[in-house]
A protein has these predicted regions:
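Secretory targeting signatures
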Residues: 1-58
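Glycine/threonine-rich phosphate-binding loop and adjacent beta-strand/alpha-helix elements that clamp
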Residues: 55-80, 89-100, 405, 418-600
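Cap/lid segment of the alpha/beta-hydrolase catalytic domain
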Residues: 130-206, 382-393, 579
């Protein structure tokens, strides 16, 4: 990768050049108007002299951005033009929230603590919008090894906003969720209590005398989840969210068609152990929901269709559906197509099988997307992009990092938080696995040609899938299918959510299939799908399966956008488990018989 660093001299020359060009354009219009005055009315001439905003590119066109000289001197991207303002000293605030209705035995009142930086134009009485990062990661970690508190600009996400947006007249706020840092109350992992505190933080930021009443949120992973939690409460101050690999609901984060990720067993405990101080004050952080969370993972993993937590614990922690009902803001969705921490199905899956992205889009929400072949990273996080392996985005590294990310986000926030500039194009920027970017109206693309391949046409080895109960599985029996080339003389572009429908016979109330798709010629991984046979209909609703039951497993691959060269086909390798998924609890007692001749 080549890095170009703009110098001060180059920026001065560029600025003078732009001013000179605009002066010449202005003089040409003056001369033209003088000539036209001799022959005709001035109607329209003065309008063209001063310009029509619709006829002039307010920002550089997306297709021309690759020609621009981006500042690549930092660990994150920069806006094209530095703002005229500076950040004032950090300020702090603590306010109390009535929590008497959210926790049965928890505190009736809890405090939210936050820190914020105002831009210098507020000294003149100007009102400004707020960009907030809401997180459990302030003062996070074991005692003596904690991260910074809210009053320190956080590395990465906070620094990115502080450097790029505060100079342009935005306030930056960093908010600690309940039970973390100096915020009191229960650490209610993704629960109703946590959402209530987040909502009141948005309300506080939007109602301050220095605020213009418009709040936008930013952040990745958990800090993307808190954005959906805020949206679920529907604050009128919350105008836009930018979740980057943000969790939309807890159950689909930890389970895919019943297949459990290893972390599902310990997720709540991991967070709780890193947010407490191990002293008497911790008693305030322990509530019934925390104890319930400790048991939710093992119970769901072992009980399947008999799990008592599905209708309470996980439903409470599903936010995207509540936001859809309660909120009317805009969403800029950022997702790594090779992110196996917060999987792409957080964006492209819903209880009825339709992608959430398109559900929001078709309901009239203003939605935009940027989908790159990166992992659990920001679009401009080049230090992480460079470490991706083949089959996991490695083939796209050369064109992956978006040095225009800060500018792209700037144009989004300017419109939705200030009402400045043109409305952003509501499209999807999607990167293919070979690195090529393109623009679609939506994703998965609706104009894609659907093609069905019978697995009966593929050469198969094995018909049983089984293993033992360990993390990642230990295969005893596997199925491999080698399928013929899609085309001998044309490239094939796979784009969307590939379905894998398997005709199977069960041996037990349980059993699981993990399928990896590869390029049959190169062996490069293209994607994966997984399913517990009790969830054979798809989604998260299990059904009891009896021995010798014949079930059609309606599996779906995580989002794939990949190119297949002429003469290449696909290979499917089916094992009991893979990646970081647990093998089924029933182990080698629940093999699954796959019938390729009736599968596709």
């Amino acid at each position: 990768m080549i890095y170009r660093q703009g110098t001060l001299f180059k920026k001065i020359v560029k600025t003078i050049s732009n001013l000179y060009r605009r002066f010449l354009e202005y003089m040409n219009k003056v001369i033209l108007c003088a000539v036209l005055l001799m022959f005709s009315s001035t109607t329209g001439c003065l309008g063209s002299l001063f310009g029509d905003e619709d006829d002039i590119d307010y920002y550089p066109n997306l297709n021309d951005r690759h020609k621009l000289d981006w500042d690549m001197s930092h660990s994150f991207s920069r806006v094209l033009d530095a703002g005229p303002h500076y950040a004032l000293d950090v300020q702090e605030a603590t306010f109390t929230v009535d929590t008497s209705d959210v926790w049965e035995t928890g505190p009736s009142e809890s405090d939210v603590h936050l820190s914020y930086w105002l831009p210098s134009n507020t000294l003149k009485g100007e009102k400004v919008p707020v960009i907030a990062i809401i997180s459990p990661y302030f003062s996070y970690g074991q005692p003596g090894d904690e991260s910074g508190h809210t009053g320190i600009v956080s590395a990465g996400r906070g620094e990115f906003i502080y450097e790029n947006f505060v100079p342009h007249g935005y306030a930056l706020a960093q908010v600690a969720v309940f039970g973390t840092e100096l915020s009191t109350g229960c650490f209610d992992y993704r629960g109703e209590g946590e959402g209530l505190g987040i909502h009141h933080a948005v309300e506080w930021l939007g109602s301050q005398e220095w605020s213009n009443g418009n709040v936008g949120l930013y952040g990745k992973s958990y800090e993307g989840a808190t954005q959906w939690e805020a949206a679920a409460y529907g604050s009128e101050y919350l105008k836009t969210i930018v979740p980057i690999s943000g969790t939309t609901a807890l159950h689909p984060l930890l389970y895919k068609n019943g297949s459990a990720e290893a972390r599902s067993q310990v997720m709540h405990m991991n967070y709780f152990s890193s947010t407490v101080d191990y002293n008497a004050d911790d008693l305030d952080n322990i509530c019934p929901d925390i104890l319930e969370g400790f048991f939710a993972g093992p119970t769901t993993y072992g009980a399947g269709e008999f799990d008592p937590y599905m209708d309470n614990y996980y439903d409470e922690r599903s936010h995207i559906d509540k936001a859809f009902q309660n909120w009317k803001g805009s969403v800029y969705w950022i997702q790594g197509m090779q992110d196996w921490n917060v999987d792409p199905h957080q964006v492209f899956s819903s209880p009825d099988g339709k992608p959430w992205y398109q559900i929001y889009q078709e309901a009239g929400f203003e939605v935009k997307g940027m989908l790159g072949q990166w992992e659990h990273n920001y679009p401009d996080q080049w230090t992480k992009h460079n470490n991706q392996e083949t089959g996991y985005g490695g083939e796209a590294i050369h064109n992956m990092t978006r040095w225009d990310w800060a500018q792209d986000l700037f144009e989004w926030y300017e419109y939705y938080l200030k009402g400045v500039g043109p409305k952003p194009d509501l499209n999807v920027q999607i990167q293919r696995n070979d690195g090529e970017w393109r623009v679609e109206e939506t994703w998965p693309p609706k104009d894609a040609e659907k093609k069905t391949i019978s697995l009966g046409d593929c050469q198969n080895t094995g018909v049983f899938v089984s293993g033992v109960s360990v993390v990642g599985g230990a295969a005893q029996q596997t199925v491999t299918l080698e399928c013929p080339a899609f085309s001998e003389d044309e490239y094939t572009h796979i784009s969307g959510l590939v379905k894998l429908h398997l005709d199977t016979i069960a041996f037990f109330d349980g059993g699981q299939i993990f399928a990896e798709m590869q390029d049959s010629n190169t062996g490069i991984r293209l994607g994966h799908a997984t399913m517990d046979i009790r969830y054979h209909a798809g989604g998260s609703e299990p059904q009891t399966v009896l021995p010798n039951d014949r079930q059609f497993m309606k599996m779906e691959f995580q989002g794939i956008d990949a190119i297949i060269p002429p003469g290449h086909g696909i290979r499917l390798i089916m094992t009991e488990s893979g990646e970081d998924y647990l093998a089924p609890l029933c182990g080698n007692a629940c093999p699954i018989h796959v019938i390729p001749s009736n599968s596709n």
